[in-house]
């Protein structure tokens, strides 16, 4: 190394060298001259080696001459590979570097020692592993050690390799064909070293030989490359000649270096001629050429195995002399201590980084460099894994690594222990209070919240384990990467030990034992690190220590648990089945838990308790037990200590081990003795004596004996005890064994939240119902009925168990904490909420269930449907729904407060621990008991479904199903409340983290509104990440919140949520920026899918600042679909809320009976679905306050069969229009899925504003013609109309004279069809008409006089009348009123097929006027769009265009109205008689009565006022359509511009 070189004064002392004569000097004066020149040119100082011996002098001179430096190079792979060849093992050297190759350009030199590859230390790796690392990518970073750039080449090995090896590694540059070189070769003889000066001469001669050899090798490589490109005989001869020279040089170099070895004797084996003969016989030219890459630098490959063994030199030299040609492919032949046959030593020792045949070699795995590349490899190496664990424990949070290892431990555990391992895994890593909590997927977390861990089936165990292992694997790999970097810098533990293990790694038993022994020492160091943890982290450290020790045991490492860990193991796992490390403890535990009968046969523990010594004594003990139950609380108060001890041993086992008995033993009916054997753990300690368990009321209602002591619960009523005694006597009569009764205690007296689970587990199943009834009764029942009774029995008993759990929560926690004043009243409400209400509801439900059982004396419950409906529907449903929603929605806050208070308040923590240690909690924590209410609600529909499944009577089954549906409604209501509460909690957190400091007034005019944004005042609907694609080159990662009326686009920065405005330069206006608001109001939103990306969607907002189009990209297609659906739904909901229907005057009582068009209101009242409830995902833009959307409802008649026919045709029409809509959407452009027209064609075939104006004209005609109300009805109905400002209340003098112009404008805008005007002219128009062209000013609108009504009726539209449509007559035929006008479009008459000339199929998309009670609805369009008349007015006019065109209103409204111009004698294609019969005759059955004009003048005036306002809005809507068309054209042009720029 360069650090070991001498200083200048050391290298040049004052003493001059004294040269003695030598054979070499006397024979070769020329050589002496060359030697002096060489010394001068390389700063060679012979005095440095004058006092050294032969071996040391050689090494020191090399070190002095060639100072080694370490450097890092980066090689970029080119077409010819990396351009270098490596050789050697431990370490690996650069064998050769291609001329002008990638390695040479990077600065790699022949002879460089490779230290690291991509940061991985490879000094102890073989060349196969190094090549694999180099070839792993298109570039590689090498840390190499070698001569400084520009200095002469040096041997491949450094000073740690012996001189005898150096002679075979150093390339030389002198050509053997030069005169000087040939002369040197001829004069060189075996050196005779006489004195210290001759060592210098000898070294110089060796150097010359090396350079000659290297030059010849390089020449050979060039010749072979030329031969490969252009084979020629001349090149082949030169190659053979070079191959002859190389062995000669190697032989001389071997002799020169061999004489310097201590005790080395060179014995030539045969002349060179023989050698060449052998090589030619063994290897043909093809073979020689085939090994070009492997033979380019055959003079180097040191081996650490025998580099210090001088005896290996002669053996290798003998082999070289025998096989000189094959020695080209055998690198560093003198470094192998054992010489094998030639065929076994050729291929594996040299390989180039670009060698394509590398993959076929047998790949060796070196422990040090390879096992740390992957955790999978590391798991089988105990010592290496222990070092890695030490590194992670010392530097990081080891939770993810320990989670991964414990998951692996589960996979390698036998089936008997997997449940225990999973429970520990859940407690360590998945539980909310886990000390080593890791990130758990949301779905899995929600599933775990609903299940009790010990009741989860094994297939889910494996799924959860695999999921968690995959989730933490990336983090483990990051730890491994950090470890590799630290290890390369020498910052890790036990490096020398691992190096030795890697060198001896043969995977034999001895090596594995050494690894385990080494791992024991490293584990001890890990424990030392854990011991230094703070007191607050003691539990976490103990858990970490336990996990590490368990996994090390799995690997066979002998570890001893510290004393402080042994006594904690019972608390670490859920079950007492965890094996104890000390045999005595285990035996003691078994003695206390499993040897039940010896303790039973002993003396009783207390006089008040009884043992379960034999089944025959059960009745005597039962009789002796009841007086105790009926005693006062004071009579049992002296025994709390013993009863607690007794229950501690029994309940603990029942709540845990009992759950693991086979399921078939639970349901076995034939033998109660089998129950006793299977449940031996419960029989032993006397916790479930036979006499106790034979009374279900005692245990199920809260174990009154115990609760009297602890809770002061009232004793069970006498009738209850008598009922239970009767049940016991009934069972005893028929000889059923008693032990089955103990399951009463197991499942309901001592257990808990197993009610909330529906696994076939011992604790979940109630006592077998078949044991409660006589044998004769059972024989008279069908198997289906027996199943039904069992499910009913389970419903009753699990309800008892739930009541007991709620009482535990109330008495053990709530009452005590309130008495002791540990929490304030507000904190009590936050944690326990309305616990009293919940408890009373379930107590009442339990009492009603008991009453049902009492009235069925044979325990066979026949009818239960009515009772279930009473409990779960009507008032009972409402009470339970609201109470449970209040309690359960508070659950997230309660659990969070418990967690935070336990950390901050030591008094509260002590209380909780003390309460949870109460045996009545059955080892459940407070955080486990609170969710039991939610879990109970999930059980009801399942049980009721099972009851219905086994019910044979149809009426009864329907009642039970209906009750089950009500239970689901309760559950859904509560789930929604819980979700909203959780969302509210998250919104509060988001509001706390919201950062509005980036908002600037210059960027966005409404910045103050954004700064004052309060998320907590809204409800959150959805949230998640989205990517905002601003343009082709700019994307922004967003965290998006969908609230009830806005969409908020946030950016995550650290822990903040930043609200920031972004700008974009539009292609059409390159000189200005368009600023996008991060808050989008849903009342202005239209959503469309992006045609070119199925994960993206357009959110188009029409704000006060203009149109804003956001392209948002989701992570998956399903997520995009969810976002699109929710945004559409919420936008529709916001628009619906902002619009109210206009009430119309009610009909007289006599005419109300004949009204056929009342379904909208009827449906609203009956089904709770608003007229605009069904929303289409394709919404039109509108302002934030006005526009709503609604699909037309298929209104049905309440009493007539005509409704079915009409609904059928309405459904067909809707389907056809939806198909047309889908087809329209499919024809959108490539960049925008909006109907963007071509610039040279009309924008749209349908003009919704014109349609609306046309329909408004028809509405006006209808009202003017038919509406007449009495003064009384006007006064009654006036309350339905809100008060509005009127533009003009004066008499209207102008008649409606321009309806034909309205029709003309409509036709020219929508159909582009020629039509006949009043004068008979044919007019065709392709451009949209402006309002001034089509309509008169507003003040010209007035009521038509009576004598002009006939002409008003003549104003009809080709689009309304469809000649091709058949006549759909209602029952009773079509009367003169022509009521089809109010039916679906398909109901129009076909009596006049010749009328309406110029009509087309497209005209079938008519607008139907429906008068439904107090509401007027215009329908007939598919996607829905509403427009409000004013911010104060909510319109009931529902306009439904085919595709979404934004409807925007502004303060500047130009108001027009359609009018009629038939006064000029124009000929109409429709006669008044036909119109009256077909269109307006329906008024006989409507809610209106034709009155004289004088009687309804006020009403007509008010209606006309509303119509004027509608007209104004629709006129503006038409203008907006035109503006929107221009905007779409601009966007289309921008998209085309972007496309062309992309292509260019």
Curated annotation (Swiss-Prot):
The keyword Cytoplasm applies. Residues 1-62, 247-346, 570-706, 1138-1179 are annotated as: Disordered. The keyword Acetylation applies. InterPro entries: ARHGEF12_PH (IPR037801), DBL_dom_sf (IPR035899), DH_dom (IPR000219), GDS_CDC24_CS (IPR001331), LARG_RGS (IPR037884), PDZ (IPR001478), PDZ_sf (IPR036034), PH-like_dom_sf (IPR011993). Residues 28-45, 313-329, 582-592 have a biased composition (Basic and acidic residues). Keywords: Acetylation, Chromosomal rearrangement, Coiled coil, Cytoplasm, GTPase activation, Guanine-nucleotide releasing factor, Membrane, Phosphoprotein, Proto-oncogene. One of its GO terms (molecular function) is G protein-coupled receptor binding. Residues 663-676 have a biased composition (Low complexity). The modification Phosphothreonine is found at residue 736. Signal peptide: none annotated. It comes from the Eukaryota. SUPFAM superfamilies: DBL homology domain (DH-domain) (SSF48065), PDZ domain-like (SSF50156), PH domain-like (SSF50729), Regulator of G-protein signaling, RGS (SSF48097). Pfam families: PDZ, PH_16, RGS-like, RhoGEF. Residues 787-977 form the DH domain. GO terms for biological process: G protein-coupled receptor signaling pathway; regulation of small GTPase mediated signal transduction; Rho protein signal transduction; Rho-activating G protein-coupled receptor signaling pathway. It is linked to A chromosomal aberration involving ARHGEF12 may be a cause of acute leukemia. Translocation t(11;11)(q23;23) with KMT2A/MLL1. This is Rho guanine nucleotide exchange factor 12. It comes from Homo sapiens.
